[in-house]
Amino acid sequence: MGEVKWTKEQQQAIDVHGCNLLVSAAAGSGKTAVLVERIIKMITDIKNPVDIDRLLVVTFTNAAASEMKERIGKAIGKELTKHPKSKQLQRQLTLLNRASITTIHSFCLETIRNNFHYIDLDPNFRIGDETETVLLKGEIIEGIFEDLYEPENCTQEFLNLVEFYSSNKDDVALQNIVLNLYDFVMSSKNPKKQLQDMAEQFNVDESYNFGESKWAKVLMDDVELELSGLKDMMEEALKLINDTNGLDAYLEGFTDELLMINDLILNAKTSWDSLYNGLSEVKFGRLKTCRNCEDKKTQEKVKDIRNKVKKQLQDEIKKKITSYSTKEIVTDLRNLYPIMKSLCDLVIEFMDRYSKAKKERGIIDFNDFEHFCLEILGHEEVALKLRQKYIEILVDEYQDSNYVQEAIINSIARRHEETGNPINVFMVGDVKQSIYRFRQAKPELFLKKYNSYLEGENAKERKVNLFKNFRSRKEVLDGVNFIFKQIMSENIGELEYGDDEALYLGADFEQYEDKSLVGGPIELNLIEKSKDETKEEESEEEEILSNIQVEARFVAKKINELVNPKIGEPFKVYDNELKAYRNVEYRDIVVLLRSTSNWAPVFTDEMKENLIPAYADVGNGYFETVEIKTILSLLEIIDNPRQDIPLIAVLRSPIASFTPEELIDIRLENKDGDFYGGLLKVASSEDRDDNWILFKRKCNSFLEKLNYWREKSIHMPIDEFIWYLYMETGYYGYVGALAGGMQRQANLKILFQRARQYEKTSYKGLFNFINFINRLKVSSGDMGSAKILGENDNVVRIMSIHKSKGLEFPVIILSALGKNFNMQDLNKRILYHDELGFGPDYIDLDKRIIYETVPKSALKKKIKLESLSEEMRILYVALTRAKEKLILTGAVNDIEKSAKKWSYALEGEDYKLSQYQVMTGKNYLDWICPVIMRHKDGEVLRELAGIEIFEKVNLLSDESSWKITTDNISGILQNDDETNEIILEDIKEIEDIEESSSYYDEINERLNFKYKYIESSKLPTLLTVTELKRMKNSSMYEDYSRDMYTPKLVKKPMFMEKDKKLKGAEKGTAMHAVMQKINYSEELTIEDINRQMETMVEKEFITKEQADSVEAEKILNFFKSNIGKRLLKAENVRRETPFHMELKSTEIYESLPKEIYENENIMIQGIIDCYFEEEDGIVLLDYKSDYFKEGQEEAIIKKYKVQIDYYARAIEELTGKVVKEKYLYLFYGDKEVEIK
């Protein structure tokens, strides 16, 4: 493999030193490779080699840091093969493991650990788990509100705040505002100061000049942008008037109105008062009549333009600016000040209490990482030490940095002696791919440097543009450039997309003999959704297809066309490993969606309907899965059974298996009370008939289980209890047998893991765990289903655009382009912005009316522009994931009406679309389709808009290539029929096969097929250790084909027993129950043991019969024995520990052929009576109450050896420690027996 040929710009990014360097790396430009090469060059420099641990490399994720280390390691290894004796390279390989290649959070954490004493932090601090911090925040915010409601603390400002921003029924909405505002300000360098400054913006007096405020500037800029759009429309109208005979009467009026708009634009650039006065005088005269115009179509178009301009200017812009005088604005601000101050005080109070609570618990959270680090770096000696250590700081994905992270980097950067500016920071990223504003990323940090840094060699602050794309085909790059050169600007996108920002071809794809099967134009497929007006005749299938399904089904057909040679020509992709073209596979195709919520499940279902293997990587839906809702309902009723909804959910589930009719009977027993009361009444009711007796027993059985589980939940850790419920109820195995069983079981495992994390916190108990889960749903959103897919699985992946960032795929299908942007946040009662502060609604409590304040209007405009800019960058990320083929799909309600709306693009003469029109776009199609309207390949769209072929339109000359198609429900269903016809034709081809045909034997063999692995279907999926012991001690256990694993009723039901005294096994169970619960912390006597058993009976842990069957003397003898004394001395004792582990079926059934059954696993479960730890290992102890004669100890050992060995193995897997000794304690003979 030859040496890498770096481009001129890449080489500059690798070689330039001695100044701050910003590398603007376009999508697919090889920025990671450049970053690695820059580091390698530095550590292998002959004159001034730099040790790898003298560099600070900051990455965005832990995965990126690991990949970076791996790449650097490989690069060093490669250099070592050239220079095997190089001590410098060997040293770098050694230093690599401790090199500072890390995320900013990891760097902050290391700085805190090394300098904790500067901020009075306990050196034994730990990182608070999300489980703990969610609960802690909830606890604190509730405590604050409770305190503030106390008469001595309650203020009118607080009550007004509650009135303003709480819902009608509770103050949860206000609590969430406080929590969200806390998260928001924590991305600033000084959160408390920012909050105070935000409140103080409302602290104004009568002399306040609103026109000088940031709010006024935003509104003026917005009005200027809107007016510019209206100006373009009026200029287009005047052009039509001048070019059309008979419209002269319109000329004077339109000209005057255009001049009026020009004056207003000048006013918007001048001052608030100038704009206010100008808009106050806006009037539109009556339009003169034109009787001689023969071109009625143009005349109507001109009138329509004027009506739109008039409506927008008078009803929207004028109303927005002139509704409030400056005096009224000042009054609103002054009235809002105490409310805003109260809100800020509330957030600061939360901040203080939360910090105090974390300190008391010895924990820190992720927000603390950056703020504590910044506080430590405020001590010059620490900053100086790090400044001297790091010769260069390299920041990856710089476009996603925030203000705190920027301050941290600047604190440790070396500085120019004269200017004081940083000189050793290398920043690489692409602001066009900054899509994490919701995580408080600040792309303006990148943009400020991008606009101020120079490209010259002598620049003290220098930038390099990497514009060559080494990922995608020319067709993809040309299409991306064609779109973004027209829509991305400083206003929307926050960057002017010009030649410097465009993508240029860097990849070299080999030629293929049939060019129609590779690459090709970008496809845009427009699908017409169901119109409001229903057709007179509509097929049943058309009626049941939802709009999302229509698009999903179309995408499925498109995938089949690409992959299935029977349906369409097989598309070819280039395989880098094979160094050749091959047929596209499902794993090469990714369907991207802006949001997977609601959409991904529909797409997955449609794929499955079309026999396409698909997997959706969704970020939500976890808490809505049946299995999780059922288990959470079970936990809720174990905590408190008097909750109707979760109780009914459990009763209807396979855990209890009650029928709807039985639930009705329960309700009828307690019509006015709760459902649990109904259950109790049925259980204690008089016998009526045979059916009622069985029903009553069913209720009693469930109540007994529920009471037992409630008792169990008190004494078991939550994670162990949840796993116990899975096994005890059989629900884990049940869901595994359903469709998608692996996914369902994986979801249950996630809940178990969450419980395990919860157990590590300072919170305990089932109630707190349920509270945590409920808070998690609200605060952190849904967790997303468990991941069960491997990277190499041959499936179509459906994922969000955010998840695809940094990845690349041969074929991208970007769907749901007709889905409107989500602007719901703009409707919240209060908005906030790091530059503009608060934007609240005002609520007149006397008149009970709510209205939008001027500050809120300003914030809505600002946040909308920033949101649209983010959406534009998200679109850029999506389009640039494609290597070879890009397919776009989107649905619209009325395709002709939409096309007419998009045709505005044909009216402008500038290359860029009207920024006003781009701003009014509601979805991605509103940006993409106007662009393609202006392309020679956009003829389909122009025809839909009613533009005749002979009409003169302004088309742009461009190398991009597009294929536009339109479809609707009927067309998609017809395609279904055509696909089915193809399959039917294949069947007909083999219909008349004679016996002598070469197919006969194959068909005969298939029809008489016998499953080769029939025995595997008879293997159990789960065994208890007791069953395993019984089988292995049986001479028949190797006969795995017997149906001995089918559950059998081997015990007579209790209600049929005449003599209800406890049998031997039941006595053993009673002894185990007592040994599990007995408190041996004090010196025991027979009286103590009897007293404890009485308490166990009172608490219903054991029955009176069970207590009577246990001899207290036997228990006392145990504790006097050698093994009992050792147990009493042990510090860590575990009793009744449930476990599960997987074993290979060939280990259990040794006669099974390994080559066939090697991958067949069986789940083993059991409960270990007792084990305890000593210094040199673990001692396992199992209690037995078997009757035996003197001298039969060896028989007992033989009987239980298998069981004890599995217990020991389970303990070693659970603890990672060695089981040094294994004992049976035989209560019958008061003997301990060691099992070797």
Curated annotation (Swiss-Prot):
Domain UvrD-like helicase ATP-binding positions: 4-473
Record: residues binding ATP: A25, A26, A27, G28, S29, G30, K31, T32
Coiled coil: none
Gene3D superfamilies with a match to the protein in the record: 3.90.320.10, P-loop containing nucleotide triphosphate hydrolases
Keyword Isomerase: yes
Any single biological process term in GO: double-strand break repair via homologous recombination
NCBIfam families: addA_Gpos
Record note on quaternary structure: Heterodimer of AddA and AddB/RexB.
UniProt cross-references to HAMAP family, sorted A to Z: AddA (MF_01451)
Name used for this protein in its record: ATP-dependent helicase/nuclease subunit A
Record organism: Clostridium novyi (strain NT)
The gene coding this protein: addA
